[in-house]
Amino acid sequence: MLEVTEKILASINATPMTYGEVENLPYLKTISHYGIDYSIETLIRKDYINEKIVDRHKFRTEEYRREYGEFVRTKYYATRKGRRYLMEHGYLE
């Protein structure tokens, strides 16, 4: 797995994050949106992270959707398989 993808997985494992929060991680400033999207899709496809919808009641209002956009309503969580991968590769003890 790419080093950037592993770092994204480690960050999501530490704290569940939205796409915007992942995008604003300090070590991803030089990575394109395509690279971040590819890493997240790879993690989802390999079942290392899951998406969960949050703030479902807030998202029903039109002004909330206009202000925050689509990506705010989902958070990424590390799965058990993802945490096991991190342990095997030395990110967790």
What do the PLM-derived regions correspond to, one by one?
Residues 62-93:
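Short, amphipathic alpha-helical interaction segments positioned at domain boundaries
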Residues 54-64:
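A short, conserved strand-capping beta-turn/loop at the end of a beta strand
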Residues 17-27:
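Short acidic, hydrophobic short linear motifs in intrinsically disordered regions
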Residues 1-11, 15:
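Short alpha-helical segments that sit at the start of domains
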Residues 30-46, 50-56, 73:
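Short amphipathic alpha-helical interaction segments
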